[in-house]
Amino acid sequence: QTGNVLEPSCGIGNFMGLVPESINDAKFYGVELDSISGRIAQQLYQKNSIAVQGFENTNLPDSFFDAAIGNVPFGQFKVPDKRYDKHNFLIHDYFFARTLDKVRPGGVIAFITSKGTLDKENPNVRKYIAQRADLLGAIRLPNDTFKAAAGTEVTSDIIFLQKRDRLVDIEPDWVHLATDANGIRMNAYFVDNPEMVLGDMQMVSGPHGMESACIAYENAELGDLLRDAI
């Protein structure tokens, strides 16, 4: 109900605007690289602390935030930051890594990210996260979830993490991929917990050939499916 909440890529503040009244007393900190979106957020949510700059340039203290939320930016490029350069993270992976350092031990992260975070063949970023946080759960969303808002069809996941109080050399099942009953490669968590996939996993034609996608169920309300999953 109170505490410090970070949104490291807040856009115009849509998430902040939809916060339940029960946590209205929390202090929200937003970061937004785009100057127009950031200034809009500053005007809309004047009681929040919103920095219009790159996440990598912020001076936010480590282990300060009780929670972090947001839709992390996605792309095939890296963010220059000496603290993390050795890990060779792409931008979405970088946002997970830096946010983990900003959240206190026991704090929770709830991020929306492309399915690439959990499904890519290279497990390095998942191992990095697992050493620093416990996976509380994940929900796979249909690829048309954000079509109306963003005009894109991308299979996305909501990932819930709780930061550990120390680094642990651990490699849980969700670090790795597995194959479902239909022969589709995906994160082992979703193979073990198919009820957390809110659609039908299929192989579809993508920009680089065939790829897996979560296709929405016909005549199903995503809101109802999401409530059941949570």
Question: What is the predicted function of each stretch?
Answer:
Residues 148-230:
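Flexible, glycine-/basic-rich loop-and-beta segments that form/coincide
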Residues 77-81, 121:
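Conserved ATPase-coupling elements of RecA-like P-loop NTPase cores
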Residues 35, 88-147, 154-160:
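Conserved Class I SAM-dependent methyltransferase catalytic core
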Residues 2, 103-108, 127, 179, ...:
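Auxiliary N-terminal substrate/complex-recognition segments of SAM-dependent methyltransferases
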Residues 73-75, 116-118, 145, 165-167:
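Conserved nucleotide-binding/hydrolysis micro-motifs of P-loop NTPases
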Residues 82-87:
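Short glycine-enriched, charge-decorated loop/helix-capping segments at active-site entrances
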Residues 57-60, 144-148, 206:
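A short acidic, often aromatic-flanked loop/helix-cap motif at beta-alpha or helix-coil junctions
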Residues 1-77, 89, 101, 106, ...:
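Conserved S-adenosyl-L-methionine
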